[in-house]
């Protein structure tokens, strides 16, 4: 017994020494005389991690913004074995995402994505190369083109009507708006991804939401210290994620097979249709034989996971932050409701075609994306070669973070940046399509989010209906300034706590 214990102890100690030697060796290799961007001092093994102690690490974009005030808008940190550069100004965003876009077109695949997505076959983390070019073209031309997004209007109209009916059932009582909006967005994304005939749709939605939540809770330690990849294994989080994925994969296998069988029927003509879902589109393209790289079942699954991870939480989070800010700012609420109700005067049913001329509501959405950006650090990039930015050298394989949260609160760019003022987007035409570097909620350049049109469409119609059909009150006599606005950082940065409000039906007939 003692011999076994001694053998185990000696073996564990030797493994620890090997891991320690590798970490120190890697650290020494990276300690070169390159003119790196300024940053906090570094210690062996842990690098700059100790500087984050005592800072708001639950909201890392706060911590990075605080450090940037001392070290500048282009800052280098060594987080364990991860070499990281953080950009925190619109000027640095432009230098990187425009002038060096090609050189930083790679995405580092985080530990969670490696566990779940077959080494980055999904849209977000697919490595830069031929397959990325193909899936990017498919995304922009087929899956999320303006025409395709518009063709899915019937799904948004149907599901938003169901959401409004459910809210009517809670009239004059405290109801969970977070759940209502999340249910709407998840179902819209599911129907767009694989249609409405799936018997396990609700189960898949539940599993996907569980996976997104679990993925956001997985430690980043394996990315900072690859040798510590055993931690999620010991904690059970890796197995938990894989079990969810395994269960969801069974549903996706059934869905994809059902779609394949449909393509074999005599009624299938192989032509493009406005009622095609994402699986239909991918199978149609594969069947033409025109794709340079064949699409596998695993690739289709990865695309679906990308759509759910990027499309559900982002849209619902934006809608809920918009409603939260409107409840905190009654004058803005009054103004946007007046616009919506004047434009839609007397309508009992609102169609998507009815909401095309609501400039102030669109300004409310933009201001929400500025003040409550769902992805405050955007998705990281990685240098494929050494680059020079602002006189500094950034080595190959350096991860780059864009602190969009810091940029959207820069007082040199935004007057009263902490205040919710939609008028700023009326007075100055600023778009979110990646050319205004002070406002990049969907990123910019080659790796800009291809689904931004889809995401915005999933916000506009439900928000217009919430504003048109109901007057809203805070529960329990709460004052606007008392509304909890605490954020929670994860895959997206949403409300930490659900939003509970009291809806009162608006008298539409009284408008006439």
UniProtKB/Swiss-Prot annotation:
Binding sites annotated in the UniProt record for heme: 449
Cell compartment(s), UniProt: Membrane
Keyword hit for Signal: no
A single GO cellular-component term on record: membrane
UniProt keyword Iron present: yes
Pathway entry: Secondary metabolite biosynthesis; terpenoid biosynthesis
Membrane disposition: Single-pass membrane protein
SUPFAM superfamilies named in the record: Cytochrome P450
Cofactors required: heme
Main location: membrane
Disulphide linkage map: none
One Pfam entry name: p450
Known EC number: 1.14.14.-
Transmembrane segments: 1-21
Keywords: Heme, Iron, Membrane, Metal-binding, Monooxygenase, Oxidoreductase, Transmembrane, Transmembrane helix
InterPro entries the UniProt entry points to: Cyt_P450, Cyt_P450_CS, Cyt_P450_E_grp-I, Cyt_P450_sf
Domain of life: Eukaryota
Biological function: Monooxygenase involved in the biosynthesis of limonoids triterpene natural products such as azadirachtin, an antifeedant widely used as bioinsecticide, and possessing many medicinal applications including anti-tumoral, anti-malarial, anti-rheumatic, antibacterial, anti-inflammatory, anti-pyretic and diuretic effects. Catalyzes the conversion of tirucalladienol to dihydroniloticin.
PANTHER family: CYTOCHROME P450 FAMILY 71 PROTEIN, PREMNASPIRODIENE OXYGENASE-LIKE
Name of the protein described by the UniProt record: Dihydroniloticin synthase CYP71CD2
Organism: Azadirachta indica (Neem tree)
């Amino acid at each position: 017994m003692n011999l076994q214990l001694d053998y185990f102890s000696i073996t564990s100690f030797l493994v620890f020494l090997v891991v320690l030697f590798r970490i120190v060796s890697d650290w020494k290799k990276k300690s070169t005389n390159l003119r790196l961007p300024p940053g906090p001092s570094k210690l062996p093994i842990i690098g700059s991690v100790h500087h984050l102690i005592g800072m708001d690490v639950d909201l890392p974009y706060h911590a990075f913004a605080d450090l940037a005030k001392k070290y500048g808008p282009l800052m280098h940190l060594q987080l364990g074995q991860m070499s990281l550069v953080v950009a925190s100004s619109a000027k640095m965003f432009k230098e990187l995402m425009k002038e060096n876009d090609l050189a930083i077109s790679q995405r580092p695949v985080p530990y969670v994505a490696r566990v779940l997505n077959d080494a980055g076959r999904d849209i977000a983390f697919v490595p830069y190369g031929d397959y990325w070019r193909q899936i990017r073209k498919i995304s922009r031309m087929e899956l999320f083109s303006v025409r395709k997004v518009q063709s899915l209007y019937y799904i948004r109209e149907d599901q938003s009507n169901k959401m409004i009916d459910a809210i009517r059932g809670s009239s004059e009582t405290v109801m969970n708006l977070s759940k209502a909006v999340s249910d709407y967005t998840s179902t819209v994304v599911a129907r767009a991804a694989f249609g409405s005939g799936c018997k396990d749709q609700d189960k898949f939605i539940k599993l996907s939401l569980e996976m997104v939540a679990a993925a956001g809770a997985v430690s980043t330690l394996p990315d900072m210290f690859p040798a510590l990849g055993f931690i999620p294994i010991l904690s059970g989080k890796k197995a938990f994620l894989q079990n969810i994925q395994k269960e969801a994969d069974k549903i996706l296998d059934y869905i994809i097979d059902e779609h394949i069988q449909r393509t074999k029927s005599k009624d299938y003509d192989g032509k493009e249709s406005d009622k095609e879902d994402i699986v239909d589109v991918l199978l149609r393209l594969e069947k033409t034989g025109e794709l340079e790289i064949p699409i596998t079942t695993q690739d289709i699954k990865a695309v679906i996971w990308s759509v759910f991870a990027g499309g559900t939480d982002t849209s619902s989070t934006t809608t809920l932050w918009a409603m939260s800010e409107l409840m905190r700012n009654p004058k803005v609420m009054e103004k946007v409701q007046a616009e919506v109700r004047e434009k839609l005067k007397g309508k009992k049913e609102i169609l998507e075609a009815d909401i095309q001329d609501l400039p102030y509501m669109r300004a409310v959405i933009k201001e929400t994306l500025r003040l409550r950006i769902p992805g405050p650090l955007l998705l990281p990039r990685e240098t494929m070669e050494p680059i020079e930015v602002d006189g500094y050298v950034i080595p190959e394989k350096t991860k780059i973070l864009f602190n969009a949260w810091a940029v959207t609160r820069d007082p040199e760019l935004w007057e009263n940046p902490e205040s919710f003022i939609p008028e700023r987007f009326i007075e100055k035409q600023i778009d979110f399509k990646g050319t205004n570097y002070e406002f990049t909620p969907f990123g910019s350049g080659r790796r800009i989010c291809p689904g931004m049109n889809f995401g915005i469409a999933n916000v506009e119609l439900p928000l217009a209906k919430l504003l048109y059909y109901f007057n809203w009150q805070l529960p329990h006599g709460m004052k606007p300034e008392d509304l909890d606005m605490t954020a929670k950082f994860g895959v997206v940065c949403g409300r930490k706590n659900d939003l509970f409000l009291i809806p009162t039906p608006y008298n539409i007939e009284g408008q006439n």
